[in-house]
Amino acid sequence: EISLGLVGSEMCIRDREGISYLVAADLPAVIIDVMRIGTGLGDIAQGQGDYWQMTRGGGHGDYRTIVLAPASVQENCDMMTTAFDLAEKYRHPVLVASDAAIGQMVEGVELKDFVDHDIDQYDWAIRGCKAGQAPRKVQNVYYTNPQYPEFLRSKYQAIEDNEQRWESYHAEDADVVLVAYGISSRISKEAVNMARAEGFKLGLIRPITLWPYPVKAFETCKNAKAFMTVEINILGQMVDDVKLAVENKYPVGFYGTFFGLPEPEEIVAQAKAMLEKEGK
């Protein structure tokens, strides 16, 4: 079991083939990507341009990875425990998709008590050659087994059924529901409070797992007339997942920034404009 921390472009340069091999070998790992801005060399400024790379595998072959999205320095810390637990539970890589705003932020953190962890509880873990111990082998050619496709499909189905995580904030009665993760979700929550003070019913769904995407969260949005993602990227990389989550029954818009964080006032204005455009 391993952990590795990277930023932005390092993820595709150094890591993608390795993640594909980890999946093939059915091995747990935790990889951290502190997302930053831009393609190519990029910049250390705030950004959320790695969403597609995080949620669509990114390497070769048929695989997905569990992706957690912290929204605070506290969650940066707490989600490491969650990530390792999930990695071991499913024998699968888990990505922690933080962003440069949180990565460069100073906040107080409460460190939780350590929990005893039995490192010998798994029969697949390599612990060195002990006298009388049966050999333990790691291989990455399980896919030659005729049962492998069903094994992998059932693993992903179990993850989708059991590991969707999200935070809902005033989404149940909202006319427009914002969808945002990471630092964008914190700014969006401020926008919701601002809009509510004006009498405009704005809500927020914050995906905590980017995969499995929390489609169950959208079932509670009974009053919604439109959805709008708030992201720090150019192309609105999360829009397609929201469209799938709402089964294309509602308009899904996008408000994004590139250099600089989104402003709550502009988020509210964009949400109002979207509602007016849809004539609702």
What residue ranges belong to the model's regions?
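Redox- and metal-dependent alpha/beta enzyme cores, enriched for Fe-S-associated oxidoreductases
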Residues: R165-K201, I205, W211-A217
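Conserved thiamine diphosphate
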Residues: A45-A100, G279
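N-terminal alpha/beta PP-like core and its mobile active-site loop of ThDP/TPP-dependent enzymes
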Residues: D15-P70, I119
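Short acidic, glycine/serine/threonine-rich loops at helix termini
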Residues: D15-S20, G40-G47, D78-T81, M105-K112, ...
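Conformationally flexible catalytic loops at phosphate/diphosphate-handling active centers
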Residues: R91-S168
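Single conserved hydrophobic/aromatic residue that forms the stacking wall/gate
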Residues: E1-G8, C12-I13
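Peripheral docking tails and interdomain loops at the edges
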Residues: V230-K280
